[in-house]
Amino acid sequence: MSNLNNLTSKILNDAEEKKKYILAEAEAQKDKIISKKTNRAEADKEEIITKANIEAEVKKARIISNAKLSVRNDMLRAKQDVISKVFNEAIEKLQNLSNGDYKYYVISTLDSLELEGTEVIIINEKDKDIFSNEFLEALNKELESKGKKGSITLNMEGKFNGGFILDRNGIQINNTFEALINSLRGELEFEVNKVLFD
């Protein structure tokens, strides 16, 4: 019986040893899995934080860029408004020329156009006192003295503020103040911008 007890005891001891070994193996495996999962979670966390930081920087840069662009556009719009105001004031100054200066502008402009003497000068109703019959007669006499026809006529139906339009056989040459300033605007805008904002 003692052999049986020894054998039973040995089996129980072996089983206990095997159990301890299996439990130790399982514990080691558990620790290994937990460590691996913890490391993976830590790496994932770092990756997520890095991506979030990159996305935040990109978003921040985009917001700053959009804000700068918006400010730039607002400044350009404000500058353009100021420049437009300057050109509009120039038109107003031309519209407020004295009668003598206004006539001088018209006469010097007409002299530069090489008139045939049969054209129609279109003016607005407001300027009819400046361009009287005496003015027209003097202009036609001057043209006749140059060997041209002296039959220029006036049309007071212009829908513009200041200046005139010369109609030569249906072809109109626009010498209104608005047209004059607008034709010069492209050339002068850069210079006006420099004077105003530099």
UniProtKB/Swiss-Prot annotation:
One of its GO terms (biological process) is proton motive force-driven plasma membrane ATP synthesis. The lineage of its organism: Bacteria, Bacillati, Bacillota, Clostridia, Eubacteriales. InterPro entries: ATPase_E_C, ATPase_V1_Esu. HAMAP family: ATP_synth_E_arch. SUPFAM superfamilies: V-type ATPase subunit E-like. It comes from the Bacteria. Keywords: ATP synthesis, Hydrogen ion transport, Ion transport, Transport. Produces ATP from ADP in the presence of a proton gradient across the membrane. GO terms for molecular function: ATP binding; proton-transporting ATP synthase activity, rotational mechanism; proton-transporting ATPase activity, rotational mechanism. It holds the Pfam family vATP-synt_E. This is V-type ATP synthase subunit E. One of its GO terms (cellular component) is proton-transporting two-sector ATPase complex, catalytic domain. Belongs to the V-ATPase E subunit family.
